[in-house]
């Protein structure tokens, strides 16, 4: 004869608080477990947001002052004239990859000052 889950729940519902406490202790001893509340491990881990430390500087478009943007790309990357022009002509294009936030912000400001539209990713 098998006892259903509903039968067990109804039996527990009819117990006094003292009887439920004794039942919990019996479960702990019999099965080697504790009735302590589980930790919210995954929820806590999801709440921790890592701050991005590396950024990519993406040239979206050169704008009206293409020559100034080419000069800025050369200054930031150390590329030659031909290579820098190819980057600017190929926009949207990656100018710098995996740089620190302050370096990425500085590069973005330099390129925007030259007339380019830039995005940090």
UniProtKB/Swiss-Prot annotation:
GO terms for biological process: translation. The keyword rRNA-binding does not apply. One of its GO terms (cellular component) is cytosolic large ribosomal subunit. SUPFAM superfamilies: ClpS-like, Ribosomal protein L7/12, oligomerisation (N-terminal) domain. One of its GO terms (molecular function) is mRNA binding. It comes from the Bacteria. Keywords: Ribonucleoprotein, Ribosomal protein. Pfam families: Ribosomal_L12, Ribosomal_L12_N. Disulfide bonds: none annotated. The keyword Cell membrane does not apply. Homodimer. Part of the ribosomal stalk of the 50S ribosomal subunit. Forms a multimeric L10(L12)X complex, where L10 forms an elongated spine to which 2 to 4 L12 dimers bind in a sequential fashion. Binds GTP-bound translation factors. HAMAP family: Ribosomal_bL12. Forms part of the ribosomal stalk which helps the ribosome interact with GTP-bound translation factors. Is thus essential for accurate translation. Belongs to the bacterial ribosomal protein bL12 family. NCBIfam families: L12. This is Large ribosomal subunit protein bL12. The gene is rplL.
């Amino acid at each position: 004869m098998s006892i259903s889950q509903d039968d067990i729940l109804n039996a527990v519902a009819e117990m006094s608080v003292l009887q439920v406490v004794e039942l919990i202790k019996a479960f702990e001893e019999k099965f080697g477990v504790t009735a302590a509340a589980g930790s919210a491990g995954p929820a806590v881990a999801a709440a921790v947001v890592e701050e991005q430390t590396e950024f990519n500087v993406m040239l979206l478009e050169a704008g009206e002052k293409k020559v100034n943007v080419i000069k800025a790309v050369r200054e930031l990357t150390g590329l030659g004239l031909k290579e820098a022009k190819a980057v600017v002509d190929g926009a949207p294009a990656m100018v710098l990859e995996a740089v620190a936030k302050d370096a990425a912000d500085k590069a973005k400001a330099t390129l925007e000052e030259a007339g380019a539209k830039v995005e940090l990713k």
